[in-house]
Design a protein with these regions (language model features):
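Hydrophobic transmembrane alpha-helices
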Residues: 2-64
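Interfacial aromatic-anchored transmembrane helix boundaries in multi-pass membrane proteins
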Residues: 31-43, 71-104
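Helix-loop junctions at the membrane-solvent interface of multi-pass transporters
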Residues: 33, 57, 76, 84, ...
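Structural signal for the C-terminal ends of transmembrane alpha-helices
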Residues: 57-61, 107-116, 181-186
Length: 195
């Protein structure tokens, strides 16, 4: 019995590592899809919603690890949107967005993990709540970063974010649909995170 449980534990850890690595790579890949707009030059990109996709699919722990791995790789390689490093982003107006990932992912992931076994319509609605709440956290922390690094007041920081809201809202709807599709195809993927 001990051999079987230890081998199943090792297999679970191995698959967790694989999921984390795959989602870190996905977040990195989606960072190269960027269009600069707005007052502060912060780009519209898929990376902001991709980290929340990691939370919705993997849950709070593995989603956080995937996001952390992405940011760790970014210390050494230019994997953030626009070909920037994590260190560069921390010294720029985007500091709030980068730090927000570490808050938004666990929040969205906890909600997703708790509702994954709900009926499909309820799950879809609550996944949307989780995704948009994570996005709201990114916007609030992003605005704070803009206030400190771009010398904007609260109104200016809020105005700088306006061009991003429509596209981010659409992106998040797509990410929620993808997450629900993944959980439909792989119904046990998130269950161990909800325990």
């Amino acid at each position: 019995m001990t051999t079987r449980s230890s081998s199943s534990g090792a297999a679970a850890r191995t698959s967790d590592l694989a999921y984390v690595a795959v989602f870190a790579a996905l977040i990195i890949a989606l960072g190269f899809v960027a269009v600069p707009v707005g007052v502060a030059g912060v780009p519209i990109l898929l990376q902001n919603t991709a980290v929340i996709l990691a939370a919705l699919v993997l849950g709070p722990r593995r989603g956080f690890y995937a996001t952390g791995l992405f940011l760790l790789i970014g210390l050494f390689l230019p994997v953030l949107a626009g070909g920037r490093t994590t260190i560069f982003a921390l010294g720029s107006p985007t500091i709030g967005y980068v730090l927000s990932y570490l808050v938004a992912v666990p929040v969205a992931g906890v909600i997703a993990a708790r509702v994954v076994d709900k009926p499909k319509a309820v799950k879809a609605a609550l996944f949307a709540v989780a995704g948009y709440l994570g996005l709201a956290i990114e916007y609030v922390m992003g605005a704070i970063g803009l206030m400190f690094r771009a010398d904007l007041d609260a109104a200016g920081a809020a105005k700088a974010q306006l061009p991003f809201i429509p596209t981010d809202a659409i992106e998040m709807a797509v990410m929620v649909a993808i997450a629900i599709g993944v959980h439909t195809a792989f119904p046990h993927l998130l269950r161990k995170e909800s325990r």
